[in-house]
Amino acid sequence: MIQFCTMKFYDRKYELDKLKEIYDLSAEFSHMVVITGRRRIGKTELIVKFAQKKDDIVYFFVSKKKPIVLLQEYRDILSLKIPFLKNTAFITFEDFFNFLFSYMKENRLIIIFDEFQNFESVEPSVFSVLQNYWDSKKNDIKGAFIFIGSVFSSMQRIFAGENEPLAGRTTAKLYIEPLKPSALVEMLEDYNVKTPSNLLFYYSLFGGVPKYYFLLDRYKLFPKSKAEVIKKLFCERNAPLQNEGREIFIEEFGKNYGVYFSILQSIASGNTQMVRIADYCGININSIGKYLEELTSLYKIIERKLPVTEYKVEAKIGRYRIIDNAVSFWFRYIYKNQSLIEIGEEKILLDKIYADLNTFMGFKFEELIKSILIEKNSDVGNNPLPFQFTKIGGFWTKKENIEIDIVAYNEEEKKIIFGECKLNGNGFNSIDVKKFKEKASFVEWERNIRAEYFALFSLVDVKEEIKRKLEKEKIKVYSLRNLL
């Protein structure tokens, strides 16, 4: 039985259902499963939940130790289920896998390797050994091999790289995404801190990454002030997240980490276009594309966004954003101000953060609203919008400098909704209404036949009087509280 000290387990129904399906099938057929996702996303906790009340699951962690030490540890773990192994020694991984595949001919086992990519430095021959046994014996055994990894580029190379021993052999892959907004709302309810302001604050700092909420729980920070949360987790000397970016990425990036860190700091600081990123970093515009492509496709740390109605993938109007909110926060505020922490000037750093926090949270509010709308879109009875959309995103133009926070549309029904996001929608006046509708006219999509809708999304509740005025202008008002 795998046991870890955990807080309440949230969400992950899809992933658990998928693992249960594989578990049931493994009674007759063997499976090879790969689970990836960024560090802290909850991959191990998912396996812990999946393993509950199952006595045929064996969990191995791939520590960076000498192979013989790992083999001794693995023998000891296996002997808890197979007692006669106590007096057996595995000298090589060939011995180890030979035993597993022989035993699994008659006995189902679910073998889990966590941080599987570490074998690249511990014992690279494992991949070829495993390939040989899998190719020759997979039809003779019952059970599954589940490989978990946090270094996405390494896991991608091991299981999809050209000429790699294990390439093309998986029967299932799971990429673990952040928790959905509804799970965060449930969490805040459990800790009696459910307010729109708190949801936006925690989402802005941590997104849907479970480990950060675990830290809030362990440090009893849920009921504390925003300043106390930031100070305790980021700004104090030896704070648990003071070196978060380094801990997550230096192994992934290797010796070129300085270039990647500069690019991530640039994007986090608001430079989202290729030219501005290159200027900020002092990198030639002809060279920056390589690094941006690697951060996008190989490492999956950033993404390139286009206006939602743009179909040309190579359009020069693309913008880059850091996918993970905690990473974005760290590179925006902590990375470039590490010296303030080291000399004990945490108050200066906190003041800097607080002076800019509303701007940062304003960007994240747009992302939160989009996430909520996406989650509710398939729930016909609970969809707040007047139709179910097939595409959602933002819209902007370069020439006219037009920007609309949210545009969603249904390609078959020819319906489109334009949304503005405000931390305080009470200041949205008649001039704003006029500008809003003028901006919508720049969206060319199905201009002559589309049905148009308009929405204002506000963090705070909008006064009834203002709401009535806006709805007379055909602008539906949604407060975050009403969307939860």
Give residue spans per PLM region.
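A cross-kingdom feature that marks ATP-driven nucleic-acid transaction machinery
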Residues: 318-484
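Phosphate-binding site recognition
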Residues: 1-351
